Design a protein with these regions (language model features):
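Short beta-strand edge/turn micro-motifs at domain boundaries
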Residues: 129-133, 143, 150-173
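Generic marker of residues within folded, mature protein domains
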Residues: 122, 145-147
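Phenylalanine-focused residue identity feature
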Residues: 8, 36, 78, 145, ...
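Short, surface-exposed coil-to-beta transition loops
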Residues: 113-117, 147-154
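Ser/Thr-rich, Proline-interspersed low-complexity disordered segments
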Residues: 1-13
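Core segments of small alpha/beta cavity-forming domains
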Residues: 14-104
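Surface-exposed, charged secondary-structure patches
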Residues: 93-140
Length: 173
C-alpha cells in the first residue's frame, strides 16, 4: 500500500481555538470592558487617594496591581487599538499612584432595557478569524420589562501574531 504524502497545506482550523475557549474569552472580554463602561474593577474603598478634585480607590483584583498589569491583561483580550480606546496613555479613569493601581469609584450600571443574551461562535472558513455573535433581548420598561425585540452584535475574534484577541468589541447591555 502506498504511504500517504504529507500535505503542504495545514488542515484549516487546526490551530484555531475551540468554541468553548472562544466563549470563555468573550466572558473575560465582557467583564474587562465593563470595568470601563459599567462599574470599576473591585476596589479597596479603605485605600483612597485624592488627585486634584478626583477621589481614587485602590484596585483589589488578583494579578492586576499596576497600570502595566491592567494594560497587559487588556492586550491579552483586545487589539492594541481597542486597548488604547479603553486605557489611553493620558487617561484619568485608571491611574497608578505610588506603584499601585487606582480607579474612580462609580459607574453607570447595566442597561435596564437589555435582557438575556445568547452568544454564538460563527466560522466562515477564513483561517485565523471567527465571529462572536451576541443577541440580546430588548425590554420595554413601559410594558413591565417584557421582551419587545432583540439586537445582534458581531465581534471579530482574530489571530494577531501568536494571540487570539477581539479586534472589534463593545458593551451589549
Amino acid at each position: 500500500t502506498p504511504t500517504p504524502a504529507p500535505t503542504s497545506t495545514p488542515t484549516s482550523g487546526a490551530d484555531e481555538p475551540a468554541d468553548e475557549a472562544i466563549l470563555a474569552a468573550y466572558e473575560k472580554a465582557e467583564e474587562a470592558w465593563g470595568w470601563f463602561e459599567i462599574a470599576p474593577m473591585p476596589l479597596n474603598r479603605d485605600d483612597q487617594r485624592t488627585v486634584g478634585e478626583q477621589v481614587y480607590c485602590r484596585v483589589d483584583y488578583p494579578g492586576i496591581k499596576t497600570l502595566a498589569d491592567l494594560r497587559g491583561y487588556l492586550k491579552s483580550l483586545f487589539s492594541d487599538g481597542l486597548v488604547e480606546e479603553l486605557l489611553p496613555v493620558d487617561g484619568t479613569q485608571y491611574v497608578e499612584l505610588d506603584g499601585a493601581l487606582y480607579t474612580i469609584d462609580g459607574g453607570r450600571g447595566a442597561d435596564i432595557t437589555k435582557g438575556e443574551e445568547t452568544v454564538q461562535v460563527l466560522r466562515d472558513g477564513t483561517p485565523g478569524r471567527c465571529t462572536v455573535r451576541v443577541t440580546v433581548e430588548v425590554l420595554d420598561p413601559q410594558q413591565g420589562f417584557s421582551v419587545v425585540g432583540s439586537e445582534t452584535h458581531d465581534f471579530l475574534y482574530e489571530q494577531v501574531g501568536e494571540r487570539w484577541i477581539f479586534t472589534t468589541f463593545s458593551m451589549v447591555r
